[in-house]
Amino acid sequence: MDESALLDLLECPVCLERLDATAKVLPCQHTFCRRCLLGIVGSRGELRCPECRTLVESGVDELPSNILLVRLLDGIKQRPRRTGSVHGTCANGSAVAGVRAQGAGGSQRDPGPTGGQSQRVQAKSTPVRGVPQLPCAKALYNYDGKEPGDLKFSKGDIIILRRQVDENWYHGEMGGVHGFFPTNFVQVIKPLPQPPPQCKALYDFELKDKEADKDCLPFSKDDILTVIRRVDENWAEGMLGDKIGIFPISYVEFNSAARQLIELDKPSEGGGDSSEGPSSSSSGPQANGSQKAPGEKKNSKKRHSFTSLTMSHKPCLAPPPQRHSMEISGPVLISSSNPTAAARIGELSGGLSSSAPSQVHICTTGLIVTPPPSSPVTTATVFTFPPETSYASIPVDALPPPPPPPPQSQSSVVGAAALNAGQRPSPAAGDQSGRQRPTVYVAMFPYSPRKEDELELRKGEMFLVLERCQDGWFKGTSMHTGKIGVFPGNYMSPVSRTVSGSSQPKVPLTLCSQAGRGVTIVSPSSALGSMDLSKPLPVCPNATPSCSLPAAVVTAAHLPTGQHPKVLMHVTSQMTVNQARNAVRTAVSHSQDRPTAAVTPIQSHNPVAYLPSTAVVLQASPVLNSSSGCSSARVGVALGCAAASLTPPNVSAASLDTDAMRPVPMVALPVNAGSTKPLGAASNHGVACRLDKDCKREKKGLLKLLSNKKKLRPSPPSSPTLEAEQSVSMELPQGAVGPEMALSGSAGHNGRIGACPMDSELSMSSSSSNTDAVTHRSSPQDNTAPIAPPPRQPCSSLLSMQHDGRPIVCERYRVVVSYPPQSEAELELKEGDIVFVHKKREDGWFKGTLQRNGRTGLFPGSFVDSI
């Protein structure tokens, strides 16, 4: 190493003057000149290391000298100087003085007619023949200054650089005058030093087992660490005070120099580029190669307290995403205008279910992830339902069992083709070990909040229920306002899904919108004869008026078998995404050859079957009727909107022998007019066998998360079990009379007060004396006390109030180290949290559900321990 380069290394990092024997070394091993240290003590009242902010307890004069520095200086003094380098190794003071004097306007001009020109040539050639002692730049143009505080200079002047304000401005000095000037007016001869690679702690990083984690570097929030190098994808090595160790990258925020160091991953060698960082990345044309080489050596070795750094000329970039295969569990609707986020979500893999992979469809207003049936709960803050999306017509028979087919026509098909036909039947009604899934509910009545965490309900407003608590309260998100809170469950009604008959083969369907809200299923059968499906259908003469059901509540018409060719299922553009999904599920389930464990509409002996007289769609639109035999096939059907106001949330409005934990609207069930045996008895055996088989296959090594609730009826009658996904399809037990409905009157004695409003239209009487008819109270006069929201109890995110027979495949883990999320797809872990892990990925990341808030996402497996 030649003498000039060695001298260039021996400079104070603060004032950039050459160090001498009076320089002091701090306890953190950083060395500074005595003048700078005294200045820091005088201005701050205390001495902290300018590099790492370590507090120094002793005085400046008590600090030791740097022995290595003293020896180097002695060696340089004793070493004979080469003849050709006399000009380049001139004393620090004289070189700087010469530059300043020349910049001031020629107080030391050489004699002769070309004195001014020779002076500038000498100043310009100084960095080439020797090494300048201060960062400097040469003026390319005249600059007169536009505002007070600007530095004026002429073309060819040498300006000492003090700092870079931003990518467009420098602060510099010329002739003792300080000021600002634009970067594009100068050419940097010697760049400013690279700022130290540092990072700021965003969280506390503590060590549980100091012996096992002895290589880690603990720190507290807001500490400033010096970054040394990147160890691997998630860890970096750094220094805090006199300690060196590794720390998680996600716990800190890097400055520009540290970000470049982390990106480079290892020091680069050689040098086509100069080693200055962002400070000189926009400083105009660079000097030639002979000028770059000394700068490289200087910056790569200047901070002798940590690893050498060499930076390339490029703007500071954020660290690239380290995980590309983000998985989003569902069901969740994710709306993002950020293409990066959309692309990351789009890379999600097959989810948790082995039965069917997830489908992702990008529509005009957002990205909709349609999960497989066994995906766990995921909370989402924004839900987008495309308002004017046109849904393609999809042949029912074109939807085979899993895997689901891709969309068949327009790119705007959202979720209609995404649902697969391979939905498994749920276990028997008594076996309740399901999980909660975000479900769309509609508010049946207005409700004014009485506490801060409650949401205001407006009639007809849609909510995504994320959690159903045991006390009957729901926790969810308003799809209109995006607010999250709790609200009484008995004020809500689910946006239901239709049920298919397990005893019927493939049946053509047509879904037509009623005012863009309700959906009616009818058969385009020739047996309907003169019935015009495009016109409102008349109601049976004896039909009693009923309430308007929520959006997408479906009433099922009996469909005769063996009479219809394949037809298309049409989903109107006014339907919400969930309605479209539900419609496809209905059509798909018709195409299955195996029983679906759903309520079975028994075929009528009449050539034309009817909707029951009490089945009503939104806005009381009339339902199918026929001129003959109307009274012979009527069945009294419980309406969820009426029952919701009359029953506690843990009692089903119409199926009191099941464990339905929320009020649900009922699907109309036409039955054989001459048959009095329980519904679905003929297919009970086959359904039960298939359920047992599915349950045994799914329950291997599974953890049941639910506590079963006692049934209100000791011995439910024989009936098909509920479809796991179809919360609306409650069976109608034979002769079910609802004395338990009176229980709802006692719900107002504690907890929150506020009567559930009722409408006289909700009143319904028994529709016939048929033994299969269901009678229940629905008139407000039948109750002695108004119905109030149920008393609030602590919600448990693990207790599912939904009747779903499939438990989550999961293991319990406890968070041992807090983890801050790096993206929306990741979970925020706090120490002590319980996480239910559903999937362990090969890259060491887990996917699971956080017990604290019910959110599902990704997190590193090293932050949790199995319980």
From Swiss-Prot:
Keyword Ribonucleoprotein: no
Main location: cytoplasm
Localisation per UniProt entry: Cytoplasm, Perinuclear region; Cell projection, Lamellipodium; Golgi apparatus, trans-Golgi network
SMART domains linked to this entry: RING, SH3
Zinc fingers typed RING-type, residue spans: 12-53
Keywords: Cell projection, Cytoplasm, Golgi apparatus, Metal-binding, Repeat, SH3 domain, Transferase, Ubl conjugation, Ubl conjugation pathway, Zinc, Zinc-finger
Top-level taxon of the source organism: Eukaryota
Matching InterPro entries: Endophilin_SH3RF, SH3-like_dom_sf, SH3_domain, SH3RF1/SH3RF3_SH3_4, SH3RF1_SH3_2, Znf-RING_euk, Znf_RING, Znf_RING/FYVE/PHD
Residue ranges of the region described as Disordered: 101-127, 265-328, 706-794
Record CDD domains: RING-HC_SH3RF1, SH3_SH3RF1_1, SH3_SH3RF1_2, SH3_SH3RF1_3, SH3_SH3RF_C
Protein family according to the UniProt entry: Belongs to the SH3RF family.
Domain notes: The RING finger domain is required for ubiquitin ligase activity and autoubiquitination.
Protein name: E3 ubiquitin-protein ligase SH3RF1
Organism of derivation: Danio rerio
Gene name linked to the record: sh3rf1
